[in-house]
């Protein structure tokens, strides 16, 4: 058990750094650091695209579970493990997703990296809106709903403020409007 102590100490420090970054990314206060700009630039390269689509989804579930949802490979972006119930299979399906914190919940963007179709997790949660989230202090059971068109503009602006690459995804998606999903915590 001693071998995990340094890692957990590191995870706590990392979680504090993530919280500080979250606070700095509050709308109207975003001043991207050189690191954030470099991460966004990298994510738009073929290597970054490969990393986001292939490698991070393999590493992040393990890392997020190990650290209680506090640490992912995509620092400084906040990442959760979203567990949905399969629309056809009825089996639990877990996906690492970036998210935004809003006043009374969390927002996830169903961009599917700009693909012409919605991601599988989006189809699952529209069929079964009760989901589980592993995201540090925000972990819990939530109910999902697709954001109304009236709310979408405000949340889309927040999403673009957090990660400018969503604009490119929207262009790649063509006629598909990228849905935004609001997760609201279920209180016992």
Regions found by a protein language model. Give the residues of each.
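Extreme N-terminal basic, low-complexity initiation segments
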Residues: 1-8
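Cysteine-centered motifs
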Residues: 10-13
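Membrane-proximal basic amphipathic "stem/tether" segments
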Residues: 25-60
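Short, structured beta-strand-loop surface elements
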Residues: 32, 112-166, 172-177, 185-187
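Short, conserved active-site entrance elements at the starts or edges of catalytic domains
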Residues: 48-87, 91-92
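Short beta-strand segments
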Residues: 77-113
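Short beta-strand micro-motifs in enzyme catalytic cores
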Residues: 80, 177-181
């Amino acid at each position: 058990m001693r071998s995990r102590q340094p890692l957990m100490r590191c995870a706590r420090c990392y979680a504090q750094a993530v919280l500080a970054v979250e606070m700095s990314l509050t709308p109207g206060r975003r001043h991207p650091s050189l690191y954030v700009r470099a991460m966004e630039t990298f994510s738009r390269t073929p290597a970054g695209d490969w990393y986001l689509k292939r490698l991070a989804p393999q590493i992040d579930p393990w890392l997020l579970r190990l650290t209680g949802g506090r640490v992912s490979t995509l620092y400084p972006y906040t990442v959760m493990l979203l567990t949905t119930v399969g629309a056809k299979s009825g089996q639990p399906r877990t996906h690492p997703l970036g998210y935004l914190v809003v006043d009374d919940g969390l927002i996830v963007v169903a961009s599917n990296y700009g693909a012409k179709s919605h991601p599988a997790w989006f189809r699952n949660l529209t069929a079964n809106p009760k989901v589980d989230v592993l995201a540090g202090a925000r972990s819990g059971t939530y109910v999902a709903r697709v954001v109304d068109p009236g709310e979408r503009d405000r949340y889309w602006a927040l999403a673009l403020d957090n990660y400018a690459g969503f604009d490119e995804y929207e262009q790649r998606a063509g006629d598909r409007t990228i849905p935004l999903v609001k997760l609201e915590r279920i209180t016992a």
